[in-house]
Design a protein with these regions (language model features):
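Accessory nucleic acid-recognition modules appended to NTPase machines
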Residues: 31, 35-199
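Amphipathic alpha-helical "lid/sensor" segments that cap RecA-like P-loop NTPase cores
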Residues: 2-48
Length: 199
């Protein structure tokens, strides 16, 4: 860090502005975009993944609708600790049709594609006590690379977020995690989550 620079207070920020930041995301091209267009870049990025990128460089063809189902499930479970079994149940609950993502192997395959495309950033669990791993949660917390992608997958707007503060909270947590991860990468550090299983 540069200790010669003065720390600046950014002042207060309204919850409405945070909702807009969640939809806008960290896309440099989105900084000066009109407010009614801030969700277009994340949505276009998801569309590009589904229509072009997910099958590029691979002989195996993946189904666009299944990938969309998975992305929407990951978005619904943003900043949550969920396994593949829970993702499958989530898809069965929210999606219609017979051709669902119904096996863990298929979910793993599609998650590998998203990982290869740097679209997911699973946050590892912190564990200091190496001799007693049962005392803390070990599962990673699920994140798309930018919370604006989760918002785009779910068709969220600032107004919709403000009407659903539970979802707003998970997206805000993802925003904080994204920014802290960027700082930690610069410092060659790691960002973990912690959940104590002892009750």
């Amino acid at each position: 860090l540069n200790h010669t620079q003065e720390t600046l207070n950014t002042g207060s920020i309204e919850i409405q502005q945070i909702a807009k930041l969640l939809i806008r995301g960290g896309w440099p091209a989105n900084i000066n975009v009109d407010e009614d267009k801030i969700g277009l870049i994340p949505k276009s990025y998801i569309d590009s993944i589904l229509n072009i990128d997910m099958n590029e460089g691979s002989e195996k063809r993946r189904d666009k609708n299944k990938m969309r189902m998975l992305l929407k499930s990951l978005a619904r479970n943003e900043a949550s600790i969920v396994g593949n079994k829970t993702i499958i149940k989530d898809i069965e609950e929210y999606e219609n049709g017979a051709d669902l993502l119904s096996s863990r192997d298929t979910v793993n395959d599609y998650l590998d594609v998203l990982d290869r495309l740097h679209l997911i950033e699973n946050q590892e669990a912190y564990g200091e006590n190496y001799r007693s791993p049962s005392r803390v949660g070990k599962s990673p917390k699920r994140h798309l690379t930018d919370p604006s992608l989760s918002c785009a997958c779910l068709g969220l707007t600032p107004e919709k977020l403000l009407k659903d503060l539970n979802t707003f909270g998970f997206m805000f947590e993802a925003l904080v995690e994204r920014d802290l991860r960027i700082y930690m990468d610069y410092l060659d550090g790691h960002l973990y989550h912690f959940r104590d299983n002892v009750t």
